Amino acid sequence: MQLYKKYVDVVVMQRKTGELRPLYLCWNDGREYKIDKVLSHSRKESCVGGYGIRYVCIIQGRCRNLFLEKDRWFLESYQP
């Protein structure tokens, strides 16, 4: 199966240290998904192209890669 970049809105907390912590994903139709836990974050290349900060997150019990690429957020998704 082919992976795609799915750009999403993200609600983020920025700590006084400058660290960003994603809290929620927001879909175009208004649905919001709480990010239950951020397991790690580091600079990585995405399988779908691009390079940025990869946040390995638990969202509704599933492990997902959420990327911050310059000033936009995307998920690696099987649906465009």
Features from the language model and the residues they span:
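Cysteine-centric segments in proteins
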Residues: M1-P80
